[in-house]
Amino acid sequence: MNIKFPIAGLTAVIAAAGLAACGSDTSDSATAAPAASTQTAKPLAEIPSLTGRTTAVALDAGFVEALGTLKLTPGTVGDAELTKAGSLVFPITGGNVKYYKPGTVSPYVQGEIDHEGSGFSLTGGGKKVELTDFVIDPGKSVLTGNVSVDGEEAAKGAPLFFLDGRTLEPLKANDDGTAVLEGTTVKLKQEAADLLNQTFGTDALEAGLVIGVATITVNTA
């Protein structure tokens, strides 16, 4: 990983970008009143190129129960993994993050965390929906992705999940050169709920449904 700032600054930018650490249902995690453009403001810390490690989501029991009630079966797409413990794991394939002094620019955390070539599927009622190529926007507390239904593209870069960081735990730095952020709650967005309800002929899925709790692990060296 190309680190452009000292390790203290790196810790700050990881914490700020960690699945929208301060996100809530009613406010964006890294939004502040604009005081300067990014052309004049300089970031306090920056990760120009994210490489490797994962974003994992431990599926919530309520979500799993809802899938069972709707007779929907989850699966993986591409390089994703579904662990025996019930976590969906998506490799981080790229991205970049800049962290500005809050109040100087809006949003003060900018960039993206990419998960190209992986995703998960829901199958039921003769239909199969695949959600893939996730992109985390740490400034907006949103995860977007591509959606296909029975192999046909239904949406590209659609807002799928809200990332609520109010339950986020402190950053953990490990001896193996990684940093771990755990505790962000992943919730279904209205756009995704509407698409899934329409596809599977139900109205049971609602915005705000808790999908699970996320853990993001990135390389720091």
What are these regions (language model features)?
Residues 1-9:
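Bacterial N-terminal signal peptides that target proteins for export
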Residues 5, 18-32:
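Bacterial lipoprotein signal-peptidase II cleavage site
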Residues 114-125:
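Short aromatic-glycine motifs in intrinsically disordered, low-complexity regions
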